[in-house]
Amino acid sequence: RFLIKKYDNLLTMDVVCHAVPSPQIFSDYISLVNRRLKGRLTDINMRDKSTRGWSHAFTYRYDLADGRSLVDQDKTVDWGRLFFAKLIDRPSCHECKYTNLNRASDITVADFWDDDNMRPDLRSPLGTSLLMANTDAGERLLRDVADPITMSAITERDTLQSSLPRPPSAHSRSPPFPRDSHAHPSRP
């Protein structure tokens, strides 16, 4: 609907999302890290693979203006604990109208590894992604890229990650979400 007319060479893709924290909460987190590290962050990588590889997806790397680069392992950092406990989700995420099995795109993409319900033969230390064709164009694309990548067909039941068929649920102890967190512009 957005593009008004159909484009034959356009493929659309959507991403299965865990939830999104507010820009204000992220800005507050960056300020906290700057104070703790006594410096100014120039970059933060929340999925750093440089020190421990792909098997440790929750390694954080902080690059600072003075040239320091620091690594914090796993979920020991405040951000990871809050994010994965669903304590900083935007309320709109819990009502997301796009989170359902009737996807509007040609292809749906998701992280698909380290899932307790995943078939053991699909596990890989390099990670596994879900590529789900939703249209004929999506099926053609998957057939076209099948050669250079390793693909396995799975049942629809196998694809039912918690965030695919329905929005994430709110944490029962989630604090009231600050009103200004919705409108706060993100800062570098």
Task: Please provide the spans of the model-predicted regions.
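A short alpha->loop->secondary-structure connector
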Residues: L3-V15
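Active-site adenylate/phosphate-handling loop in enzymes that bind or generate adenylated species
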Residues: V15-V16, D115
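Long, compositionally biased charged/polar accessory segments in the mid-to-C-terminal portions
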Residues: N34, G39-P188
